């Protein structure tokens, strides 16, 4: 019985491997053909010669973070901890 189980498992894994391999090969073939087709279109001059503002890369960009602190702010974790301590009888923080 052990040999039959191994054979069935081996066949299943072979099918999974085959499907994966053919999927990868098919997607590579599709990708290469679509890229070749787009490069032929660009060589023909069918694409616009004037670059638009959207297609240009930004020359430089940055991220700015603004942090605003409130004077009497209590974090949510501290609120939950105080609520938990009020139910369990533990010492909570005094306001």
From Swiss-Prot:
GO terms for molecular function: protein kinase binding; transmembrane transporter binding. It comes from Homo sapiens (Human). This is Small integral membrane protein 26. The gene is SMIM26. It is found in: Mitochondrion outer membrane. Detected in kidney (at protein level). The chain crosses the membrane at residues 13-35. Keywords: Membrane, Mitochondrion, Mitochondrion outer membrane, Transmembrane, Transmembrane helix. The lineage of its organism: Eukaryota, Metazoa, Chordata, Craniata, Vertebrata. May play a role in cell viability. Interacts with AGK and SLC25A11.
């Amino acid at each position: 019985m052990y040999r039959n189980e191994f054979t069935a498992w081996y066949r299943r894994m072979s099918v999974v491997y085959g499907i994966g391999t053919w999927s990868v090969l098919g997607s590579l073939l599709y990708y290469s053909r679509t890229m070749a087709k787009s490069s032929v279109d660009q060589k023909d001059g069918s694409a616009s010669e004037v670059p638009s503002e959207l297609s240009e890369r930004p020359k430089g960009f940055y991220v700015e973070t603004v942090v605003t602190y409130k004077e009497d702010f209590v974090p949510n974790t501290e609120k939950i901890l105080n609520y938990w301590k009020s139910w369990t009888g533990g010492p909570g923080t005094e306001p």
